[in-house]
Curated annotation (Swiss-Prot):
Residue ranges occupied by any SH3 domain in the UniProt entry: 45-107
Bias type Polar residues, positions: 246-256, 555-567, 701-711, 1650-1667, 1733-1747, 1892-1907
Non-traversing membrane segments, not crossing the membrane: 1145-1165
Function: Plays a role in the transport of cargos that are too large to fit into COPII-coated vesicles and require specific mechanisms to be incorporated into membrane-bound carriers and exported from the endoplasmic reticulum. This protein is required for collagen VII (COL7A1) secretion by loading COL7A1 into transport carriers. It may participate in cargo loading of COL7A1 at endoplasmic reticulum exit sites by binding to COPII coat subunits Sec23/24 and guiding SH3-bound COL7A1 into a growing carrier.
Molecular function GO labels: cargo receptor activity
Alphabetized PANTHER family for the sequence: MELANOMA INHIBITORY ACTIVITY-RELATED, TRANSPORT AND GOLGI ORGANIZATION PROTEIN 1 HOMOLOG
UniProt-annotated stretches for the region Proline-rich domain (PRD): 1751-1907
All ranges on the Cytoplasmic side of the membrane: 1198-1907
Keywords: Coiled coil, Deafness, Diabetes mellitus, Dwarfism, Endoplasmic reticulum, ER-Golgi transport, Exocytosis, Glycoprotein, Intellectual disability, Membrane, Methylation, Phosphoprotein, Protein transport, SH3 domain, Signal, Transmembrane, Transmembrane helix, Transport
Protein name: Transport and Golgi organization protein 1 homolog
Residue intervals annotated with topology Lumenal: 23-1144, 1166-1176
Signal peptide location: 1-22
Length: 1907
């Protein structure tokens, strides 16, 4: 309770602050929240698709209502609300709902944008109502208790996460960034968790840790208390899983509703994760980092350890991210070692994985402080190990200690720490519970395992608890199992040591076994842990598949506990068994023995699990082998498995039948193949055996098994290497990597796991039969079985590699299983399917089981049976997988992927049994259907089981109601309708679930090839639906069918996944019986498999060696003898696989002979001993060919020489007479019987007709009477009602009369008053009408004014538009002009500047000009005055120069001035132009401004006018509205009246239409009845005609029988004459013989006259030994004459047995029924028309097809082609044409007697035939007697017509030969020589006999008339 204060603090801190904000903040206003989280800015994109976990009805219309299972589409989430509320749509309705009530199925986007909310987001989305007073979501949803519990859950989840974080900072780090697990508890925690709470969380976790430390200090009390509190916390935290647990009833501590809601989410995810991790890929198992899981999945323990930390960090993140989806809830196996290792690494790993799965039980482990962890480690190791060591006698402790210390000391410490708290707590808690190994399941599960899905944490705690119990249980179980196993091990070790002694490298077999056991032990223990967990899980799961998932955690715990025990037991077993077996085959052997011993207990489940795994493993052979190892289970587990086995068979039976069949078929086929392989090995030399191993192993197992046989260590290496190959496949998974590491650590384990996996398929199947309870023999045979299992493993591998035929065979068997699978899913069904499957599996298993497994422990048998039983569930998958493997479609890669899925499935198997019961209760239909854990877990992996259960329950209820309501004759149709509707609905929902689950798996990164698994799951759905359907329709029939085969239930359990776990008590007797039942198919299959394996052995051996290269291929290294010795037990072990006891005996004899020959050969001196081969050929084929040659020679001698005996006449006169008498008697009896039967038939028909007529009459009368009664009753009721009503009416009317009289007086008064009122009203009404008229007039005026105003308004609008357009145009012009003005102004400024320049220039020029003028004047004056001086100055050149220059300068200046003046003039002109333009633009601008002002004035005036008009309009509208109201009132009154009248009219019409319809229906019924009457009359007439025809035929038959009797009498007379002749001849012959030999020999063959002797008969006996039909006619009347020629005389009326089969047409046509038997049996004779033309086929040429013969028989037997005698038609009469007189020899022609001969044919030549014998015509009316037109005696005596030499008929072959003259001794004295008869070419037999035409005619006519 130390955590209580922490909880309170958390509650206060987390809940109160959140509750307060839940209340409406003033800031939020009329909103639930200020912000919402959307996928896009508009919140229009989908965020999630979910599924409602519970029904929800919102407090008002703002919330959306939904029911459980409804799909919910989420568009946005409200941010930071206490009860986290999402908004989404359900169907067409949109609204808010609490997040916790849905489970997210698909996430469309992970991006979340925070968008502010608006008040319009919180109105009713359908009607827009927004008058709500409360916007506090917490208060609105307060009616949901969810949130309280959710708060606690989230708090607890926070606490747990804190604990996990403290324990695993990496995990906490990883967890924090991973909010995606929102789907699980993370969403709740998201609302709860905030950055502010992290400190609190740390404090809380520290408090928790302290409390845990204290509690750990107090192991019994403190731990229990803290554990309980932690469990509570965990349950709260894991409410989602707990909801599952609550459902499973494992944890009732948490509020059911909250748990359910949260649990639904987590459940599905966890279930999928658990299922996947638990039995999916071994890689998943690796995730758990338990050595067991490592061992289970990856054989690489070292790799696992290395990956443990990495993976766990990653796994924690993944788990946190996926919280329940992680594949990490992988198998956690607690064994002697694994109990330690899981405790070690498992705790570290589990803290991450399990904590991540929010399994609070792990919290206990996780919360344990590091110091405590160390102590716990020591405690666990010392505690569990000491227990295990005590149990195992120290070997296991050594192994466990060494292995654990070496492989995972740290992990052990961690796991031990984590586990110790639980183990300590669990121990005191479960001391009582754990006391009984049988109770282990219960005890283990007694621990409150709130986390069912959180297998990781649960597993950790389970490791702890499992250690507690597991230790105790393992003590007990190990002690028990150890004793048994030690005995077995001793024997097995002795056997193996003897076998392997050569291979053991001089170490004592036991020591080597121990060493190998240690190494293998580590592996096997790890594997066993995994196996145990798988087993316990599988067992638990099988017990309650529904609960398994929910209780996945608890299951894993119990599984771990049991696994611990199992591991200990197995360790012991393996040590004992396995000193040798642990070697290559040790693990398989140990697995088998332990599987048989432990797995028989748990092994049943484990094996079933492992078997199914193995099936998958067969694909992933290596990977799955690892998983298959989990079969090992502790004795406790064994007990559990037994219970589980009991349940499992049921579960298995419930398994989808197809799967079961497939599984069983695959198992049986694989087993048979393995067995065959083993048998083949036994038969073959050691090399052949090795090859066989190699083939079976397919390069992996073979080498391993052989190596293991030869050298235990190398075998392990080879197996490890073999495992490496599969592990490489697994490497795709992290688990595979871990597996590699673990494999590197424990190569032996890998080998074992590999072998175990291989074994499991065999063993699982064999195990199913192994239930044969003989334990002690199993010790020795265990070793043998181990060897055989090695071989079988090799065979399994061979099956995988070369075993494609096995798959095909399995698939062949599957149909059988499928057929039976269709039966109700019950044990009986299982037994049926088992029966079906048993033929092969049964034989295989029974042989193994009966021979070897009988010796095996009953537990082993149980295990194997359980294995076989369970495997079927996955066998179907595995079958698919195997088929894929075999077919090469998806080799081991896909197989590995599928095994991963299976491993996932398997983890749930560890679910606690108690939970199962609860879950079973929840899932009645599914649990009753899935009686196998694996299939159920797989099913749960993909589907929401509860939703499907609800749908199935609904379907069942619908079917029930339909069944009850519908009539019996119509029931099936109604049920089918309901079934189809429900089926489509359920399948669509299931497909959606599957899609969502696949998408989730994809999101979670689970890359699995689940195609077959998904298909199998969908098949399961369909099977479930059909299961529910046929529960209601044919449940009784199916039940009877199912119940029939109790014996085969055991086998069936084994075969069909029934998991004879139930039938642990399978006795050998049952097995033997099953063996007896199964015997036939397996032998063929075995032979085929053996042949195939031999064929592929050689080719595959090198491959196997290559695969095995890593380990020394000990097969080759070891001496052949040793290998053979090893293989002999293997072969011996597998030989029993052939199912029948006879085969068992043969196999035993064969093995004994093989051994004896080997020993004899060994005794020979070396120089004489044969080499390995015979001139390059193997000895085996040489021996076989020699034996076959001798046997064939002997048979030839026997058939030729020895069979030759003195010839004795076959028939004597007495015999003939006796037979004739008997025949006559039989004939008379038959005639009497026929007549009696005919009379009876007639009477019965008459009775039938009478009864039918009576029934018809009675039924008609009954119907009429019923109708009359109904009508009378109705009339009576109506009359009674009317009478009552009339009485009441009378009384009421009387009362009313009194009242009415009073009322009348009052009414008169009121009438007067009313008249006054009426007058008043009339005046008022007239006034109102006047007012109305006025109003109408005014209204018209108003309307006209309105129209006018509207027109004016329209005109004004148009003017306004025009003005506006003009304004726009003017404004444009104005803008242009203003721009021009601006440009002009600029140009004006420029011109002004230019003018100033020009003015300046002008001034300058004027100055220049003035100066020039001045200068000119000066120059003139100077020139005049100083003319004389000029010369001087010029002479000087100075003065003159200056003047010139001045002049020039002045001239230039003047020029410049002139230029400037011209420029100025130009500029001035430009300026003038611009000024003109400016003036014009200014004037236009003024004009435009004036126009604009005018327009504005106009607009204002128009607006004023418009306002006035609008006012007028308003007033007019008001008037109009008033008038409309008046009119409406009047119209309403009128409409009411009209509606009333209309309603009355419609009622009248309705009544009339109803009456018309009734009249029409009545007329139709009358017509139908008339039609039926006519039909009945027609039928009666037809029946009368048919009966008359039958009477006529019977009369004809009676007449024909009479004729036959007459003919028989004549035939007897003829026979007497012949007998007299024969007597005479006999006397003559005897006299001659006596004279010759001087001996009184009555009858002796005449050597010189073969024709006097009956030739040796080649054909078989006749069907009943009576006189057969003549060889001529093949038992028919000879008319077609295309039959065999009569090869012997009349005297040769021999037994059919003496006649060659080919002579009477038995070759081609049906065997001719003996003439006598046909008549004696009362059946129409073959020749009779009644017998059909079946026998006619013989008469018409035998080569012809039956259809043709039938046609011939129908067409009056007229041949289709030319008649057999061309020129002489067969049917002389029908064919027309005179019949030539027959030529005859000898006495006058004999009539065709009933079976008598026709007149004798000509002498026997090659082309002729001897005359027809007396009975050589088919039974029936003598041919001559039937055709009255031709009297038989009308034929002339003489020779029968010879065959014309013209063209022969289509099937006639005329054999040329000299015609012999008629024999002197008489035509019928002797048969022709045997050479003539026997050596005739087939054509001669096929040609018709040259019988006389008369015979042909008579017979043909007889046949013609017979119809």
């Amino acid at each position: 309770m130390a955590a209580a204060p922490g909880l309170l603090v958390w509650l206060l801190v987390l809940r109160l602050p959140w509750r307060v904000p839940g209340q409406l903040d003033p800031s939020t206003g009329r909103r639930f929240s200020e912000h919402k989280l959307c996928a896009d800015d508009e919140c229009s994109m989908l965020m999630y698709r979910g599924e409602a976990l519970e029904d929800f009805t919102g407090p008002d219309c703002r919330f959306v209502n939904f029911k459980k299972g409804d799909p919910v589409y989420v568009y946005y989430k409200l941010a930071r609300g206490w009860p986290e509320v999402w908004a989404g749509s359900v169907g067409r309705t949109f609204g808010y709902f609490p997040k916790d009530l849905i489970q997210v199925v698909h996430e469309y986007t992970k991006e979340e944008l925070q968008v502010p909310t608006d008040e319009t987001d919180f109105v009713c989305f359908d009607g827009g109502r927004d008058d709500f007073h409360n916007y506090n979501v917490e208060e609105l949803l307060g009616f949901l208790e969810l949130y309280n519990s959710a708060a606690t859950d989230s708090e607890k989840a926070v606490e747990k996460t804190l604990q996990d974080m403290e324990k695993n900072p990496e995990l906490s780090k990883e967890r924090e960034p991973e909010p995606e697990p929102v789907e699980a508890n993370s969403e709740e925690s998201d609302s709860v968790f905030s950055e502010n709470t992290e400190d609190l969380q740390e404090q809380f976790t520290t408090q928790k840790h302290h409390s845990h430390a204290n509690s750990q200090a107090n192991h019994a009390q403190g731990e229990q208390a803290s554990f309980e509190s932690f469990e509570e916390m965990l349950q709260d935290k894991l409410k989602v899983p707990e909801s599952e647990n609550n459902k499973t009833s494992n944890s009732s501590q948490v509020s059911n509703e909250q748990d359910k809601i949260d649990a639904y989410k987590l459940l599905k995810k966890e279930m999928t994760l658990d299922l996947k991790t638990k039995f999916g890929s071994t890689a998943d198992a690796l995730v758990s980092d338990d050595e067991t899981t490592r061992l289970v999945t990856s054989l690489e323990d070292d790799f696992d350890e290395e990956l443990d930390t990495e993976y766990y960090a990653v796994g924690k993140e993944d788990e946190e991210n996926q919280e329940d989806f992680d594949e990490l809830p992988l198998l956690t196996f607690t064994d002697g070692e694994d109990m330690k290792t899981p405790a070690k690494s498992g705790v570290e790993k589990y803290p991450t994985d399990k904590e991540q799965n929010s399994n609070e039980e792990d919290k206990v482990q996780l919360t344990v402080p590091p110091g405590i962890k160390n102590d716990d480690k020591n405690i666990l190791t010392t505690w569990g190990d000491t227990i295990f060591s005590i149990v195992t006698g120290g070997e296991e402790t050594r192994d466990t200690m060494d292995l654990e210390s070496s492989s995972s000391e740290e992990e052990k410490e961690d796991d031990d720490d984590a586990l110790v708290p639980d183990s300590k707590q669990g121990k005191p808690q479960s001391a009582t519970d754990y006391s009984d190994p049988d109770n282990v399941d219960d005890g283990l599960f007694i621990v409150d395992i709130p986390k069912t899905n959180n297998d990781k944490e649960v597993n950790a705690e389970h490791h702890i608890k499992g250690k507690g119990r597991g230790v105790q249980e393992s003590k007990r179980g190990l002690v028990q199992d150890k004793t048994e196993l030690e005995d077995e091990n001793q024997e097995g070790m002795t056997v193996h040591s003897s076998v392997h002694s050569n291979n053991l490298n001089s170490m004592p077999a036991a020591e080597k076994g121990k060493d190998t056991l240690k190494s293998a032990y580590d592996d096997t223990e790890n594997d066993l842990k995994g196996a145990a967990i798988h087993i316990s899980k599988g067992m638990l799961h099988e017990e309650k598949p529904g609960e398994q998932i929910l209780e996945g955690g608890s299951e894993s715990e119990s599984a771990q506990k049991a696994a611990g025990n199992q591991m200990n037991d197995r360790k012991i077993q393996q040590e004992s068994l396995g000193s040798a077996p642990l070697m290559g085959d040790d693990h398989p052997n140990a697995s088998r023995d332990s599987v048989e011993g432990d797995a028989l207990v748990n092994g049943a489940k484990l094996h079933t699990l492992s078997v199914e795994h193995q099936r998958e493993e067969l694909k992933e052979e290596l990977v799955l082998k690892t998983q298959n190892q989990p079969r090992f289970s502790s004795p406790d587990e064994i007990d559990l498995p037994r219970e589980l086995e009991d349940e499992v068979p049921i579960l298995g039976r419930n398994l989808p039948w197809q799967q079961e069949r497939d599984v069983a078929a695959t198992a049986s086929k694989q087993m048979s193949e393995k067995i065959r392989l083993s048998e083949g090995e036994a038969k073959e030399d050691s090399l052949d055996e090795e090859f066989f191993h190699h083939k079976a192993m397919q390069g992996t197992e073979v080498g391993q098994t052989d190596q293991t046989d030869s050298t235990g260590g190398p075998a392990f290496l080879s197996k490890v290497e073999e495992d490496d190959y599969p592990s490489e496949e697994l490497l795709e998974d992290e688990n595979a990597i871990n597996a590699k590491r673990s494999k590197e650590k424990n190569p032996g384990n890998q080998g074992r796991q590999f072998d175990v996996n291989l074994q499991v398929p065999d063993r699982a199947v064999l195990g199913t039969i192994h239930p044969d309870p003989e334990i002690e023999e199993s010790k020795q045979e265990t070793s043998m079985i181990l060897d055989s299992e090695k071989t079988s493993e090799t065979a399994a591998k061979g099956v995988n590699t070369g075993g494609r035929e096995p798959n095909t065979m399995v698939e062949k068997e599957r149909p059988l299983a499928d057929k039976k699978a269709q039966r109700p899913f019950e044990r009986s069904d299982f037994s049926d399917s088992i029966k079906i499957q048993t033929p092969e599996l049964g034989e295989v298993f029974q042989n193994k089981d009966s021979d070897y497994l009988k010796n095996d422990n009953p537990e082993e048998h149980l295990k194997t049976s359980g294995l076989a039983g369970e495997p079927e569930g996955e066998l179907s998958k595995e079958d698919h997988e195997n088929t894929e493997k075999y077919m090469g479609t998806e080799s081991q890669g896909s197989a590995a992927a599928e095994p991963e899925d299976d491993s996932f499935h398997w983890t749930p198997h560890t679910s606690v049994e108690p939970g199962h019961s609860d879950k079973r209760e929840d899932l009645l239909i599914i649990s009753s259907f899935f009686k196998e854990q694996q299939s159920l877990q797989r099913f749960q992996k993909y589907f929401n089981v509860h939703e499907l259960e609800a749908l199935l329950q609904e379907m069942s209820s619908k079917l029930k109601s339909a069944q009850q309501e519908s009539l019996p004759y119509n029931m099936e149709k109604v049920l089918d309708k309901v079934f189809r509707a429900s089926e489509s609905q359920i399948l669509s929902i299931a497909e959606k679930m599957l899609d969502t689950r696949v998408a989730e798996n994809r999101d979670l990164g689970m890359n699995e090839n689940n195609i077959f698994e998904e298909a199998a799951v969908l098949d399961d759905i369909q099977d479930l639906i059909y299961f529910v359907r046929y529960k209601h329709s044919t449940a009784e029939e199916t039940a009877t069918l199912v119940m029939a085969p109790p014996l085969e239930e055991g086998l069936g359990g084994a075969m069909e996944e029934m998991q004879p776990l139930h039938e642990d008590n399978f006795s050998r007797e049952k097995t033997a019986e099953l063996n007896v039942q199964v015997p036939e198919e397996p032998t063929h299959l075995d032979q085929r498999v053996i042949g195939d394996t031999h064929a592929s052995e050689v080719s595959q051996k090198p491959n196997t060696e290559k695969d095995l290269d890593p380990g020394p291929v000990t097969t080759e290294d070891t001496p052949m003898d040793a290998i053979d010795a090893n293989k002999q037990p293997e072969t011996a072990a597998e030989e029993p696989a052939s199912v029948t006891p006879l085969e068992n005996a043969i196999l035993l004899i064969y093995s004994f002979m093989f051994y004896l020959t080997k020993s004899l050969v060994a005794t020979l001196p070396d120089d004489v001993q044969p080499g390995p081969d015979f001139y390059g050929l193997p000895w085996k084929p040489v021996f076989i060919t020699a034996f076959l040659g001798i046997a064939s020679f002997a048979i030839f001698l026997w058939r030729t020489v020895l069979v030759v005996k003195d010839r004795v006449y076959q028939v004597t006169e007495q015999q003939i007479s006796e037979k004739l008498k008997t025949i006559m008697k039989e004939n008379t009896e038959l005639v009497q019987k026929l007549s009696n039967y005919e009379q009876k038939i007639k009477e019965s028909k008459k009775h039938v007709q009478e009864t039918r007529k009576q029934n018809m009459i009675l039924s008609d009368e009954a119907i009429k009477y019923k109708d009359k009664i109904k009508t009378l009753e109705k009339n009576q009721e109506i009359l009674d009602d009317t009478a009552k009503n009339l009485r009441v009416m009378l009384e009421s009317e009387r009362e009313q009369n009194v009242k009415n009289q009073d009322l009348i007086s009052e009414n008169k008064k009121s009438i007067e008053k009313l008249k006054d009122v009426i007058s008043m009203n009339a005046s008022e009404f007239s006034e109102v009408q006047i007012a109305l008229n006025e109003a109408k007039l005014s209204e018209e005026k108003v309307k006209s004014e309105c129209h006018r105003v509207q027109e004016e308004n329209a005109r004004l609008k148009k003017k306004k538009e025009q003005l506006q357009q003009e304004i726009e145009d003017w404004s444009k012009l104005h803008a242009e002009l203003s721009e021009q003005i601006k440009s002009f102004e600029k140009s004006q400024k420029d011109l002004e500047v230019a003018l100033t320049h020009k003015d300046d220039n002008i001034n300058a020029l004027t100055n220049c000009i003035t100066q020039l003028n001045l200068l000119e004047c000066e120059s003139e004056s100077e020139g005049q005055n100083k003319g004389g001086n000029d010369s001087d100055e010029l002479a000087n050149g100075e003065v003159g120069g200056d003047r010139n220059e001045k002049m020039k300068n002045q001239i230039k200046q003047m020029m410049d001035v002139s230029r400037t003046q011209t420029a100025i003039s130009v500029v001035e002109e430009d300026l003038k132009l611009l000024q003109l333009k400016l003036r014009a633009s200014v004037s236009t601008k003024c004009n435009l401004e004036d126009q604009v002002k005018k327009l504005e004035d106009d607009r204002n005036s128009l607006q004023a006018a418009k306002a006035g008009l609008e006012d007028e309009c308003k007033t007019l509208r008001q008037k109009v509205e008033i008038l409309n109201e008046l009119y409406q009132q009047k119209e309403m009154a009128l409409q009411k009246k009209l509606s009333q009248e209309e309603y009355e009219r419609q009622e009248r019409e309705h009544r009339l239409s109803a009456a018309d319809e009734k009249a029409v229906s009545a007329a139709e019924e009358v017509k139908t009845y008339k039609r039926r009457i006519e039909e009945m009359e027609d039928e009666l007439q037809k029946t009368e005609r048919s009966f008359k025809n039958q009477i006529a035929t019977h009369e004809k038959k009676a007449h024909e029988n009479w004729l036959k009797a007459r003919a028989a009498e004549r035939a007897i007379a003829e026979e007497k004459r012949e007998a007299a002749n024969l007597r005479h001849k006999l006397l003559e012959l005897t006299q001659k013989m006596a004279m010759l030999q001087e001996e009184p020999v009555i009858v002796k063959p005449m050597p010189g006259k073969p024709n006097t002797q009956n030739p040796p008969r080649r054909g078989p006996l006749s069907q009943n030994g009576s006189f057969g039909p003549s060889p001529v006619s093949g038992g028919e009347c000879s008319p077609p004459l295309t039959v065999e020629p009569p090869v012997r005389p009349l005297s040769a009326t021999l037994n059919r047995r003496d006649m060659p089969r080919s002579e009477f047409g038995s070759v081609d046509g049906p065997l001719p029924h003996p003439r006598w038997s046909a008549e004696a049996s009362g059946k129409p004779s073959p020749s009779d028309p009644g017998s059909g033309t079946a026998t006619m086929m013989n008469s018409s040429s035998r080569g012809s097809s039956p259809t043709r013969v039938l046609d011939e028989g129908k067409v009056n037997m007229a041949p289709k082609g030319p008649p057999p005698f061309p020129g002489v038609p067969l049917m002389s009469t029908p064919m027309g044409g005179p019949v030539p007189p027959p030529i005859r020899y000898g006495p006058p022609p004999q009539l065709c007697g009933p079976f008598g001969p026709r007149p004798l044919p000509p002498p026997f030549g090659p082309g002729m035939r001897p005359p027809l014998g007396l009975r050589e015509f088919a039974p029936g009316v003598p041919p001559g007697r039937r055709d009255l037109p031709l009297h038989p005696r009308g034929f002339l005596p003489g020779h029968a017509p010879f065959r014309p030499l013209g063209s022969l008929g289509p099937r006639e072959y005329f054999i040329p030969g000299t015609r012999l003259p008629p024999p002197t001794h008489g035509p019928q004295e002797y048969p022709p020589p045997p050479a003539v008869r026997d050596l005739l070419p087939s054509g001669s037999r096929d040609e018709p006999p040259p019988a006389s035409q008369s015979t042909s005619q008579d017979c043909s006519q007889a046949l013609k008339q017979s119809p």
